[in-house]
Protein backbone atom coordinates (compact mmCIF):
# COMPACT_ATOMS: atom_id res chain seq x y z
CA UNK A 1 0.00 0.00 0.00
CA UNK A 2 1.56 3.31 -1.07
CA UNK A 3 1.40 6.64 0.75
CA UNK A 4 -1.70 7.88 -1.09
CA UNK A 5 -3.59 4.65 -0.46
CA UNK A 6 -2.71 4.81 3.23
CA UNK A 7 -3.77 8.46 3.46
CA UNK A 8 -7.06 7.73 1.70
CA UNK A 9 -7.82 4.80 4.00
CA UNK A 10 -6.99 6.72 7.18
CA UNK A 11 -9.05 9.73 6.07
CA UNK A 12 -12.11 7.71 5.03
CA UNK A 13 -12.01 5.60 8.21
CA UNK A 14 -11.79 8.76 10.31
CA UNK A 15 -14.68 10.24 8.33
CA UNK A 16 -16.72 7.07 8.80
CA UNK A 17 -16.08 7.05 12.55
CA UNK A 18 -16.97 10.73 12.95
CA UNK A 19 -20.07 10.40 10.75
CA UNK A 20 -21.26 7.29 12.58
CA UNK A 21 -20.97 8.93 15.99
CA UNK A 22 -22.48 12.21 14.76
CA UNK A 23 -25.39 10.72 12.81
CA UNK A 24 -26.19 8.18 15.52
CA UNK A 25 -26.36 10.95 18.10
CA UNK A 26 -28.42 13.05 15.68
CA UNK A 27 -31.01 10.31 15.18
CA UNK A 28 -31.10 9.70 18.94
CA UNK A 29 -31.79 13.35 19.72
CA UNK A 30 -34.12 14.00 16.79
CA UNK A 31 -37.63 14.85 17.86
CA UNK A 32 -40.17 12.32 16.54
CA UNK A 33 -41.77 13.48 13.30
CA UNK A 34 -45.18 12.24 14.46
CA UNK A 35 -45.37 14.18 17.75
CA UNK A 36 -48.80 15.67 18.56
CA UNK A 37 -49.18 19.09 16.91
CA UNK A 38 -48.42 22.18 18.93
CA UNK A 39 -51.79 23.36 20.16
CA UNK A 40 -53.43 25.42 22.83
CA UNK A 41 -53.91 29.06 23.66
CA UNK A 42 -51.88 31.76 25.37
CA UNK A 43 -51.82 31.66 29.17
CA UNK A 44 -55.17 32.48 30.77
CA UNK A 45 -56.06 36.15 30.51
CA UNK A 46 -53.31 36.99 28.02
CA UNK A 47 -54.12 37.99 24.43
CA UNK A 48 -52.44 36.50 21.41
CA UNK A 49 -49.27 38.46 20.55
CA UNK A 50 -49.44 40.76 17.54
CA UNK A 51 -47.49 39.52 14.52
CA UNK A 52 -45.87 41.46 11.69
CA UNK A 53 -45.23 39.43 8.53
CA UNK A 54 -42.38 40.84 6.44
CA UNK A 55 -42.04 39.84 2.79
CA UNK A 56 -39.15 41.36 0.83
CA UNK A 57 -39.56 40.86 -2.90
CA UNK A 58 -37.33 41.58 -5.85
CA UNK A 59 -38.57 41.02 -9.41
CA UNK A 60 -40.83 38.23 -8.21
CA UNK A 61 -43.21 36.65 -10.69
CA UNK A 62 -46.75 38.03 -10.12
CA UNK A 63 -48.31 34.57 -9.79
CA UNK A 64 -45.69 33.48 -7.26
CA UNK A 65 -46.13 36.60 -5.13
CA UNK A 66 -49.91 36.32 -5.33
CA UNK A 67 -49.80 32.73 -4.07
CA UNK A 68 -47.57 33.81 -1.19
CA UNK A 69 -49.88 36.66 -0.14
CA UNK A 70 -52.97 34.47 -0.49
CA UNK A 71 -51.49 31.95 1.94
CA UNK A 72 -50.87 34.72 4.47
CA UNK A 73 -54.30 36.27 4.01
CA UNK A 74 -55.88 32.89 4.81
CA UNK A 75 -54.00 32.32 8.08
CA UNK A 76 -56.21 31.20 10.97
CA UNK A 77 -54.33 33.34 13.50
CA UNK A 78 -56.58 34.81 16.21
CA UNK A 79 -54.30 37.72 17.11
CA UNK A 80 -53.54 40.98 15.33
CA UNK A 81 -51.77 40.48 12.02
CA UNK A 82 -50.03 43.06 9.84
CA UNK A 83 -48.29 42.28 6.56
CA UNK A 84 -45.48 44.37 5.05
CA UNK A 85 -44.62 43.65 1.42
CA UNK A 86 -41.36 45.44 0.63
CA UNK A 87 -40.57 45.93 -3.04
CA UNK A 88 -36.78 46.12 -3.21
CA UNK A 89 -36.41 48.21 -6.35
CA UNK A 90 -37.98 45.66 -8.69
CA UNK A 91 -37.85 46.30 -12.42
CA UNK A 92 -41.22 44.61 -12.98
CA UNK A 93 -43.41 46.79 -10.75
CA UNK A 94 -45.92 47.32 -13.54
CA UNK A 95 -46.50 43.58 -13.66
CA UNK A 96 -47.07 43.49 -9.89
CA UNK A 97 -49.68 46.26 -9.76
CA UNK A 98 -52.53 43.78 -10.10
CA UNK A 99 -51.25 41.78 -7.13
CA UNK A 100 -51.01 44.89 -4.99
CA UNK A 101 -54.49 46.06 -5.97
CA UNK A 102 -55.91 42.66 -5.02
CA UNK A 103 -54.95 43.31 -1.39
CA UNK A 104 -55.18 47.10 -1.33
CA UNK A 105 -58.56 46.92 0.44
CA UNK A 106 -57.28 44.63 3.19
CA UNK A 107 -56.20 46.83 6.13
CA UNK A 108 -53.70 44.18 7.22
CA UNK A 109 -51.59 44.62 4.09
CA UNK A 110 -49.02 47.40 3.69
CA UNK A 111 -47.00 47.85 0.50
CA UNK A 112 -43.66 49.63 0.71
CA UNK A 113 -41.46 50.59 -2.23
CA UNK A 114 -37.74 51.17 -1.90
CA UNK A 115 -36.40 53.58 -4.55
CA UNK A 116 -33.43 51.36 -5.39
CA UNK A 117 -32.41 47.76 -4.87
CA UNK A 118 -30.71 47.58 -1.47
CA UNK A 119 -30.67 43.84 -0.86
CA UNK A 120 -32.88 41.47 1.09
CA UNK A 121 -31.42 42.28 4.50
CA UNK A 122 -31.95 46.03 4.25
CA UNK A 123 -35.43 45.48 2.80
CA UNK A 124 -36.28 43.40 5.88
CA UNK A 125 -34.90 46.05 8.20
CA UNK A 126 -36.90 48.80 6.47
CA UNK A 127 -40.11 46.93 7.37
CA UNK A 128 -38.94 45.98 10.87
CA UNK A 129 -38.36 49.64 11.71
CA UNK A 130 -41.79 50.74 10.51
CA UNK A 131 -43.69 47.91 12.24
CA UNK A 132 -44.45 47.35 15.92
CA UNK A 133 -45.81 43.82 16.43
CA UNK A 134 -44.70 41.63 19.32
CA UNK A 135 -43.44 38.99 16.90
CA UNK A 136 -41.86 39.32 13.45
CA UNK A 137 -42.27 36.61 10.81
CA UNK A 138 -39.88 36.72 7.88
CA UNK A 139 -41.32 35.07 4.78
CA UNK A 140 -39.76 34.77 1.34
CA UNK A 141 -41.87 36.00 -1.55
CA UNK A 142 -41.86 32.58 -3.22
CA UNK A 143 -43.10 30.73 -0.12
CA UNK A 144 -46.59 29.41 0.65
CA UNK A 145 -47.58 28.92 4.28
CA UNK A 146 -50.00 26.32 5.61
CA UNK A 147 -53.03 28.05 7.23
CA UNK A 148 -51.86 27.35 10.80
CA UNK A 149 -48.19 28.32 10.48
CA UNK A 150 -48.40 31.65 12.33
CA UNK A 151 -50.50 30.13 15.11
CA UNK A 152 -48.07 27.26 15.66
CA UNK A 153 -44.99 29.46 15.62
CA UNK A 154 -46.61 31.99 17.97
CA UNK A 155 -47.43 29.19 20.42
CA UNK A 156 -43.77 28.15 20.44
CA UNK A 157 -42.82 31.77 21.15
CA UNK A 158 -44.89 31.80 24.36
CA UNK A 159 -41.68 30.90 26.17
CA UNK A 160 -39.96 34.25 26.71
CA UNK A 161 -36.57 32.52 26.48
CA UNK A 162 -37.23 31.71 22.81
CA UNK A 163 -35.85 34.35 20.47
CA UNK A 164 -36.58 32.64 17.16
CA UNK A 165 -38.46 29.67 15.71
CA UNK A 166 -38.58 28.18 12.23
CA UNK A 167 -41.07 25.92 10.47
CA UNK A 168 -40.58 22.83 8.35
CA UNK A 169 -39.65 23.53 4.73
CA UNK A 170 -40.71 21.65 1.62
CA UNK A 171 -40.27 22.27 -2.10
CA UNK A 172 -43.47 23.65 -3.62
CA UNK A 173 -42.21 22.66 -7.10
CA UNK A 174 -41.04 19.21 -5.98
CA UNK A 175 -42.53 17.38 -8.96
CA UNK A 176 -40.91 19.67 -11.54
CA UNK A 177 -37.53 17.93 -12.15
CA UNK A 178 -35.32 15.23 -10.67
CA UNK A 179 -33.32 17.99 -8.97
CA UNK A 180 -36.35 19.54 -7.24
CA UNK A 181 -37.28 16.09 -5.93
CA UNK A 182 -33.76 15.69 -4.59
CA UNK A 183 -33.80 19.14 -2.96
CA UNK A 184 -37.16 18.39 -1.35
CA UNK A 185 -35.61 15.34 0.31
CA UNK A 186 -32.59 17.42 1.27
CA UNK A 187 -34.91 19.92 3.00
CA UNK A 188 -36.70 17.14 4.86
CA UNK A 189 -33.42 15.76 6.15
CA UNK A 190 -32.10 19.20 7.10
CA UNK A 191 -35.29 19.97 9.04
CA UNK A 192 -36.22 16.63 10.56
CA UNK A 193 -32.72 15.41 11.36
CA UNK A 194 -30.36 18.35 11.77
CA UNK A 195 -32.73 21.08 13.04
CA UNK A 196 -34.87 18.68 15.05
CA UNK A 197 -31.84 17.38 16.95
CA UNK A 198 -30.53 20.89 17.57
CA UNK A 199 -33.97 21.93 18.83
CA UNK A 200 -33.71 19.38 21.64
CA UNK A 201 -31.25 21.83 23.18
CA UNK A 202 -32.92 25.05 22.03
CA UNK A 203 -30.09 25.84 19.65
CA UNK A 204 -31.17 25.57 16.02
CA UNK A 205 -28.08 26.95 14.30
CA UNK A 206 -29.92 28.44 11.32
CA UNK A 207 -33.59 29.47 11.32
CA UNK A 208 -34.12 29.33 7.57
CA UNK A 209 -35.20 32.48 5.76
CA UNK A 210 -38.37 31.26 3.98
CA UNK A 211 -40.27 30.95 7.28
CA UNK A 212 -38.71 32.17 10.54
CA UNK A 213 -40.34 34.02 13.45
CA UNK A 214 -38.47 36.34 15.83
CA UNK A 215 -39.30 38.06 19.10
CA UNK A 216 -39.26 41.80 18.41
CA UNK A 217 -37.64 42.74 21.72
CA UNK A 218 -34.76 40.38 20.95
CA UNK A 219 -34.59 41.38 17.30
CA UNK A 220 -34.44 45.11 18.00
CA UNK A 221 -31.56 44.64 20.44
CA UNK A 222 -29.56 42.90 17.70
CA UNK A 223 -30.67 44.97 14.71
CA UNK A 224 -27.57 47.17 14.50
CA UNK A 225 -25.26 44.13 14.56
CA UNK A 226 -27.44 42.42 11.99
CA UNK A 227 -27.49 45.42 9.65
CA UNK A 228 -23.78 46.19 9.84
CA UNK A 229 -22.31 42.69 9.49
CA UNK A 230 -18.96 42.93 7.77
CA UNK A 231 -16.39 40.41 6.64
CA UNK A 232 -12.80 41.45 6.00
CA UNK A 233 -13.90 45.07 5.99
CA UNK A 234 -16.69 44.59 3.45
CA UNK A 235 -20.47 44.50 4.03
CA UNK A 236 -21.87 40.97 4.13
CA UNK A 237 -25.01 40.92 1.99
CA UNK A 238 -26.18 37.30 2.14
CA UNK A 239 -26.66 34.53 4.68
CA UNK A 240 -28.89 36.82 6.73
CA UNK A 241 -30.88 33.97 8.28
CA UNK A 242 -27.84 32.10 9.61
CA UNK A 243 -26.17 35.26 10.91
CA UNK A 244 -29.29 36.47 12.72
CA UNK A 245 -29.76 33.04 14.30
CA UNK A 246 -26.17 33.01 15.57
CA UNK A 247 -26.67 36.51 17.00
CA UNK A 248 -29.77 35.26 18.85
CA UNK A 249 -27.83 32.38 20.36
CA UNK A 250 -24.93 34.63 21.34
CA UNK A 251 -27.40 36.92 23.11
CA UNK A 252 -28.62 33.96 25.18
CA UNK A 253 -31.95 33.28 23.45
CA UNK A 254 -33.21 29.84 22.47
CA UNK A 255 -33.89 29.05 18.82
CA UNK A 256 -36.51 26.39 18.05
CA UNK A 257 -37.89 24.20 15.27
CA UNK A 258 -41.64 23.60 14.83
CA UNK A 259 -42.12 20.63 12.46
CA UNK A 260 -45.90 21.05 12.20
CA UNK A 261 -45.55 24.63 10.86
CA UNK A 262 -45.12 23.70 7.21
CA UNK A 263 -44.01 26.14 4.51
CA UNK A 264 -43.45 25.28 0.84
CA UNK A 265 -40.90 27.30 -1.10
CA UNK A 266 -39.72 27.36 -4.70
CA UNK A 267 -36.35 25.63 -5.16
CA UNK A 268 -33.92 25.69 -8.12
CA UNK A 269 -35.02 23.36 -10.91
CA UNK A 270 -31.70 23.18 -12.74
CA UNK A 271 -28.09 22.68 -11.75
CA UNK A 272 -26.81 26.19 -12.50
CA UNK A 273 -29.07 28.10 -10.06
CA UNK A 274 -28.69 25.29 -7.51
CA UNK A 275 -24.89 25.53 -7.52
CA UNK A 276 -24.99 29.34 -7.29
CA UNK A 277 -27.32 29.01 -4.30
CA UNK A 278 -25.02 26.44 -2.68
CA UNK A 279 -22.02 28.71 -3.24
CA UNK A 280 -23.70 31.59 -1.40
CA UNK A 281 -24.77 29.28 1.42
CA UNK A 282 -21.26 27.84 1.72
CA UNK A 283 -19.71 31.30 1.96
CA UNK A 284 -22.21 32.44 4.60
CA UNK A 285 -21.69 29.22 6.58
CA UNK A 286 -17.92 29.64 6.57
CA UNK A 287 -18.22 33.30 7.53
CA UNK A 288 -20.37 32.49 10.54
CA UNK A 289 -18.39 29.42 11.58
CA UNK A 290 -16.07 31.51 13.74
CA UNK A 291 -19.11 32.95 15.54
CA UNK A 292 -20.46 29.42 15.96
CA UNK A 293 -17.17 28.23 17.46
CA UNK A 294 -17.39 31.05 20.01
CA UNK A 295 -20.65 29.49 21.22
CA UNK A 296 -19.17 26.04 21.84
CA UNK A 297 -18.20 26.68 25.44
CA UNK A 298 -21.83 27.21 26.41
CA UNK A 299 -23.32 24.48 24.21
CA UNK A 300 -24.32 20.91 25.01
CA UNK A 301 -21.78 18.25 24.01
CA UNK A 302 -24.04 17.13 21.14
CA UNK A 303 -24.13 20.65 19.69
CA UNK A 304 -20.35 20.77 19.92
CA UNK A 305 -20.26 17.49 18.01
CA UNK A 306 -22.74 18.97 15.52
CA UNK A 307 -20.52 21.98 14.76
CA UNK A 308 -17.40 19.81 14.55
CA UNK A 309 -19.11 17.17 12.41
CA UNK A 310 -20.38 19.69 9.88
CA UNK A 311 -16.96 21.31 9.50
CA UNK A 312 -14.42 18.51 9.98
CA UNK A 313 -16.48 15.81 8.23
CA UNK A 314 -16.35 17.38 4.73
CA UNK A 315 -12.63 18.05 5.21
CA UNK A 316 -11.90 14.38 5.97
CA UNK A 317 -14.03 13.25 3.03
CA UNK A 318 -12.20 15.66 0.72
CA UNK A 319 -8.80 14.43 1.90
CA UNK A 320 -9.85 10.84 1.28
CA UNK A 321 -11.08 11.61 -2.23
CA UNK A 322 -7.97 13.61 -3.16
CA UNK A 323 -5.68 10.89 -1.84
CA UNK A 324 -7.75 8.27 -3.66
CA UNK A 325 -7.47 10.18 -6.93
CA UNK A 326 -3.73 10.52 -6.43
CA UNK A 327 -3.54 6.77 -5.77
CA UNK A 328 -5.40 6.05 -9.00
CA UNK A 329 -3.22 8.42 -11.05
CA UNK A 330 0.10 7.20 -9.64
CA UNK A 331 -0.57 3.47 -9.37
CA UNK A 332 -3.58 2.78 -11.57
CA UNK A 333 -5.36 1.07 -8.68
CA UNK A 334 -8.87 1.93 -7.54
CA UNK A 335 -9.24 3.10 -3.90
CA UNK A 336 -11.76 0.38 -3.11
CA UNK A 337 -11.71 0.96 0.64
CA UNK A 338 -12.89 4.55 0.22
CA UNK A 339 -15.42 3.65 -2.48
CA UNK A 340 -17.00 0.83 -0.50
CA UNK A 341 -17.04 2.84 2.73
CA UNK A 342 -18.80 5.78 1.05
CA UNK A 343 -21.30 3.44 -0.63
CA UNK A 344 -22.07 1.68 2.66
CA UNK A 345 -22.60 4.94 4.55
CA UNK A 346 -24.86 6.23 1.76
CA UNK A 347 -27.04 3.11 1.84
CA UNK A 348 -27.37 3.23 5.62
CA UNK A 349 -28.23 6.93 5.70
CA UNK A 350 -30.83 6.72 2.94
CA UNK A 351 -32.38 3.59 4.47
CA UNK A 352 -32.72 5.26 7.87
CA UNK A 353 -34.29 8.33 6.24
CA UNK A 354 -36.73 6.16 4.27
CA UNK A 355 -37.72 4.34 7.46
CA UNK A 356 -38.21 7.52 9.49
CA UNK A 357 -40.12 9.32 6.73
CA UNK A 358 -42.06 6.18 5.82
CA UNK A 359 -41.27 6.98 2.17
CA UNK A 360 -39.22 4.74 -0.11
CA UNK A 361 -38.32 7.73 -2.30
CA UNK A 362 -35.55 8.58 0.15
CA UNK A 363 -33.57 5.61 -1.16
CA UNK A 364 -33.11 7.76 -4.26
CA UNK A 365 -31.31 10.36 -2.17
CA UNK A 366 -28.20 8.24 -2.75
CA UNK A 367 -27.76 10.29 -5.93
CA UNK A 368 -26.92 13.25 -3.70
CA UNK A 369 -23.68 11.51 -2.68
CA UNK A 370 -22.35 11.79 -6.23
CA UNK A 371 -23.41 15.45 -6.44
CA UNK A 372 -21.75 16.09 -3.09
CA UNK A 373 -18.46 14.46 -4.06
CA UNK A 374 -18.06 15.78 -7.59
CA UNK A 375 -19.79 19.18 -7.36
CA UNK A 376 -20.49 20.41 -3.84
CA UNK A 377 -17.13 19.59 -2.22
CA UNK A 378 -15.16 21.42 -4.96
CA UNK A 379 -17.70 24.24 -4.72
CA UNK A 380 -17.13 24.52 -0.95
CA UNK A 381 -13.37 24.62 -1.52
CA UNK A 382 -13.90 27.47 -3.99
CA UNK A 383 -16.20 29.22 -1.51
CA UNK A 384 -13.51 28.98 1.16
CA UNK A 385 -11.00 30.58 -1.20
CA UNK A 386 -13.39 33.41 -2.17
CA UNK A 387 -14.96 34.29 1.18
CA UNK A 388 -14.59 38.02 0.57
CA UNK A 389 -16.84 37.87 -2.49
CA UNK A 390 -20.33 39.08 -1.56
CA UNK A 391 -21.78 38.92 -5.07
CA UNK A 392 -25.20 37.22 -5.23
CA UNK A 393 -24.10 35.82 -8.65
CA UNK A 394 -27.59 36.35 -10.07
CA UNK A 395 -27.99 40.09 -9.86
CA UNK A 396 -25.96 43.26 -9.40
CA UNK A 397 -24.71 44.15 -5.96
CA UNK A 398 -27.10 46.02 -3.73
CA UNK A 399 -26.73 49.73 -3.37
CA UNK A 400 -26.61 51.39 0.00
CA UNK A 401 -29.56 53.76 -0.02
CA UNK A 402 -32.00 54.96 2.59
CA UNK A 403 -35.62 53.85 2.84
CA UNK A 404 -37.87 56.73 1.83
CA UNK A 405 -40.98 55.18 3.33
CA UNK A 406 -43.03 55.92 0.21
CA UNK A 407 -46.16 53.98 -0.61
CA UNK A 408 -45.79 51.71 -3.61
CA UNK A 409 -45.90 53.74 -6.84
CA UNK A 410 -46.76 52.47 -10.30
CA UNK A 411 -43.64 53.29 -12.29
CA UNK A 412 -43.31 52.66 -16.00
CA UNK A 413 -40.57 50.05 -15.70
CA UNK A 414 -40.11 47.00 -17.86
CA UNK A 415 -37.88 43.95 -17.82
CA UNK A 416 -37.12 41.42 -15.15
CA UNK A 417 -33.86 40.26 -13.58
CA UNK A 418 -33.40 37.37 -11.20
CA UNK A 419 -35.91 37.26 -8.37
CA UNK A 420 -35.19 36.58 -4.71
CA UNK A 421 -36.62 33.13 -5.34
CA UNK A 422 -33.62 32.40 -7.56
CA UNK A 423 -31.19 33.81 -5.05
CA UNK A 424 -32.06 32.05 -1.80
Curated annotation (Swiss-Prot):
Job description of the protein: Involved in the synthesis of Nod factor, a sulfated N-acyl-beta-1,4-tetrasaccharide of N-acetylglucosamine which initiates a series of events in the host plant species leading eventually to nodulation.
| One BP term from GO | extracellular matrix assembly
Keyword Ligase in annotation = no
Query: Species name for this entry?
Result: Mesorhizobium japonicum (strain LMG 29417 / CECT 9101 / MAFF 303099)
EC number(s) in its UniProt entry?
2.4.1.-
Q: What is this protein called?
A: N-acetylglucosaminyltransferase
| GO terms assigned for molecular function | hyaluronan synthase activity
User: What Pfam family is a match for this entry?
Assistant: Glycos_transf_2
Swiss-Prot/TrEMBL keywords: Cell membrane, Glycosyltransferase, Membrane, Nodulation, Transferase
